Regions:
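Positively charged, solvent-exposed patches that mediate nucleic-acid binding
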Residues: 1-105
């Protein structure tokens, strides 16, 4: 599944484990030099760490890959957290919709 946010793009695949895992990409083309890439990676790591409650609402555990966008450099942690939690909400809605369709068959 792919989800687009204002500050990041997230890819999620079910992993069959009892916990979520995540990876980060922050390319020089998309974000900038090493200092900027490292800052975006720190922001995304902290965003994922603080999103534990939102991720707990998902029945399925996923492998997440978060792709940083250049706009992430211009915002505070709260904006990044809000954007990712919106994405998790979209994933939960998609999961709920697919579960309800599976129950009808």
């Amino acid at each position: 599944m792919r989800f687009h946010g204002r500050l990041l793009t997230a890819f999620a695949l079910p992993n069959g484990l009892g916990h979520h895992r995540f990876g980060i990409t922050a390319s020089r083309k998309a974000v900038g030099n090493a200092v900027e890439r490292n800052r975006t990676k720190r922001l995304l790591r902290e965003t994922f760490r603080l999103s534990g409650d939102a991720l707990g609402t998902l029945e399925t555990k996923y492998d997440w890959v978060l792709n940083a966008k250049a706009a992430l450099l211009k915002v505070k942690l709260e904006s990044s957290l809000e954007d990712f939690q919106t994405i998790v909400g979209q994933a939960a809605a998609l999961e709920k919709r697919s579960n309800s369709q599976g129950a009808r068959k």
